[in-house]
Amino acid sequence: MMNLNMTMQNNRAYLGADGLKNYLKPKADEYIPLVELPSELNPFLESHDIHISAKLMNTLPLGNVKSLPAYYLLNSVDAISKNVVESSSGNTVFSMGLFAKSLGIKSVKAVKSNTVTRGKLQLLRLAGIDVLLVDGPICPDAHDPNSSISIARRLGNESGNCNPGQYDNFANPQAHRDVTGPQIFDQLGENLGMFVAGLGTTGTLVGTAGYLKEVLPELRVGGVVRVPNNQVPGVRTSNDLREIDFNWKDILTEDLVAIDEVDAYKSSLDMIRQGLLVGPSSGFAYAGACTMIENIINSGNGDMLRGKHVVFVCPDSCFPYVEEYFEILGESSFPEIDNQSSGPVPGFEGNNSNNKPARIDDISPEKLYEDIKKTNPKFKIIDVREPREFFDHHIKGSKQVSYYNIEDWATQLKDTELTDSYVFVCSRTGRSLRAASIAKKIGIENVFVLAGGTAAWSAKGFDRVLPNSCLPNNKPVL
């Protein structure tokens, strides 16, 4: 007869007195899903045989990548019967709070910036975590005595308290060295060509890539950073990374790629609509991975990834950020509500139902390519990427306009005769969709976006201008 007091790990039934504890405990031998993206999400699959796969850390028991280091961090300090105090943007301290009872921890307090979203704040309270809000940025400076990190350290030194310290405790990357890295290698072996992660504490990159580079010395490694003044949860700007003590720089083989909130949320939305319920930091890493692949192809080195997998990390789910998707992407990214009831749409009572959001059509790379070959092209191309990206490569005939200046550009344009059609271009489609929506709202009627952005254009091998390259301007880089 089966002993029901045993934890049945083979069939993932966690039974007996320690069943819940064993379910929550990270396990290297229970594989976190690795899912290859279909061609609808991978513009390089058919053209270059480059595969993109997502490591779905959102499928862990606590729903986020930080639950791995959180468990290791708690076990690295004497936390039993103590009050844990931790500075965290959300998922680390959330996980600590949910591990607390099974590990015999008295209580957990989060020290957080007052810029935290309401959704994240309520999630912590839902988990029974005490919250101390302090002044300061969402990504605090570990060396600032007034930052949430320093405050958590001081509180952790008080009697009965402890501070695990995710920003400088090597238990953070060790969790990924023990679990994430070996799993990815077991799942792909030598078919792994590049590993990409968003950079916050850098623990995921340092631990995972640190292990992978030992077994695959030729592995390419990329880090993704946040564009300044953009809200993407859990990740830092390149300047903010100077405050991190882990040795992340020596692991990278690629230049840092900066992604903004619009591309992060839009890329996440693309994955959600294919069935992967991942959050904005997942879209952030995905968009960064696509940009790195595009850069490698444009440098003439696409063959080094041919037949290989590029793996990026999905840190958490979309559910804590639902309101932010609508706020950042705007209503044009979502289906209209057909309200045939007698009352207002729930949650939209104050809105004017006749004031419908602008709908933006896209143009395929093939259609735009055929147009620019004409003597008098129909479309004017507006590239809203950063100047650095534009001067690295761009579509012939395009004009660079800063995304942050689109409102001024459109306001000036609407005072002239509007007979032209404008195609907005970015690396994917997130930023260009938002820019086109702004222009249309101001009064520029004939606006479109390039489907798939410059990533899709490059994947097709269409002509690009390469100011920083010695290659001929009109020769496709394959």
Residue ranges: model-predicted function:
Residues 369-377:
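A short acidic-Thr-Gly-centered motif at the start of a beta-strand
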Residues 415-423:
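Compact, charge-rich alpha-helical regulatory domains located at protein termini
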